[in-house]
A protein has these predicted regions:
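Acidic (Asp/Glu)-rich catalytic clusters
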Residues: 14-15, 63-73, 100-109, 159-163, ...
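CE4/NodB-like, metal-dependent polysaccharide N-deacetylase domain
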Residues: 92-116, 135-139, 161, 192
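Short, acidic/polar
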Residues: 30-43, 88-107, 128, 155-156, ...
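Beta/alpha (TIM)-barrel catalytic core signal, keyed to glycine-rich beta->alpha loops juxtaposed to Asp/Glu
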Residues: 84, 118-283
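Active-site mouth loops of central-metabolism enzymes
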Residues: 22-33, 82-90, 122
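N-terminal binding-site loop/beta-alpha segment at the start of enzyme catalytic domains
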Residues: 1-76, 132, 201, 282
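Structural motif corresponding to the early beta-alpha repeats
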Residues: 77-90, 103, 113-120
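Residues at the N-termini of beta-strands
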Residues: 49, 110-113, 144, 169
């Protein structure tokens, strides 16, 4: 399975005709000035999946890059996230539609995937945001809907009000030091695709001796090993960089495979919630 992966590999989504690219490109903290350039570099390198959010304040720049790339819109998978609920469903829906306009300003523009950015903050907020996302999906402005930073209990709680359930994606922090095994196991048992943000641990582990030894063994960078690890765990990694050479290198992960011993060694680095650099979900 793993050896046959390519940059064009995709995963099916529940009850959806869409295919989610196995590798995504993250743009968190990519400023307006650099975001367009970075996205164009990523698209030229073969990425076909860009992950942004309202909170990142660069949706418009992502949309601009998609237009400038010359690649058909249908060939690029765009994800965004709604950060907080407004006072009611209609106001929250308008925030989502505003994001869609920024990302795809055609009359029939759409976003492929829209997530609740932090499903662990407010149960009432989740209810409002999900209803707004369901409306946007019903109208074709959003193709699929999901969650981020959700544990089992947050997703289970949605059953009480959701017309669309389960969410097609759960995007959580994932890397060898924070494997969130319970959330991953639950999500995958429900057919929910698991996406990995911070797969490179923001370069904080670049000097880790265990990681370095595996990178040296394969003549790869530590970042390439971490991206490949995610792919072989059946997670969808979303590596982020604004350095062109690193953007390209992070996509060059399909010519090698981590063996069973490599995977076991990396699995053994897990520190549970203490290994998180952003957030470990509460299950």
């Amino acid at each position: 399975m793993a050896a046959k992966l390519s940059i064009a590999s995709t995963l099916p989504l529940l009850d959806s005709p869409a295919q989610l690219p196995r590798l995504g490109f993250g743009v968190y903290k990519s400023t307006a000035e650099t975001c367009v350039r970075s996205c164009l570099t990523a698209l030229k390198a073969g990425y076909r999946h860009i992950d942004t959010a309202q909170f990142y304040a660069n949706e418009e720049q992502v949309g601009q890059a998609v237009k400038e790339s010359g690649i058909p819109r249908s060939e690029i998978y765009i994800t965004s996230k709604v950060m907080t609920a407004s006072s009611d469903v209609p106001a929250t829906y308008e925030k989502i539609v505003d994001s869609v306009r920024k990302l795809d300003d055609r009359p029939d523009g759409y976003v492929d995937l829209f997530l609740i950015h932090n499903a662990s903050i407010s149960a009432e907020g989740n209810k409002i945001m999900w209803a707004a996302l369901e409306q946007a999906k019903a109208e074709g402005k959003v193709k699929d809907i999901g969650v981020s930073n959700a544990g089992k209990r947050h997703i289970e709680a949605m059953k009480d009000y959701a017309k669309v359930w389960p969410p097609v994606v759960n995007q959580i922090e994932l890397h060898p030091w924070n494997q969130q095994r319970e959330a991953v196991k639950y999500s995958q048992s429900q057919g929910i695709v698991v996406e990995a943000y911070c797969p490179l641990v923001r370069n904080l582990k670049a000097d880790d001796k265990t990681l370095l030894s595996i990178a040296e063994k394969h003549n790869k960078t530590t970042a390439q090993v971490l991206v490949r690890y995610c792919l072989q765990k059946d997670w969808v990694p979303l590596p982020k960089s604004d350095t062109p050479s690193r953007i390209e290198a992070n996509a060059d992960v399909f010519g090698f495979e981590l063996d069973a011993k490599d995977m076991e060694t990396l699995d053994n680095l897990d520190q549970g919630p203490w290994g998180a650099i952003v957030q470990a979900v509460d299950n």
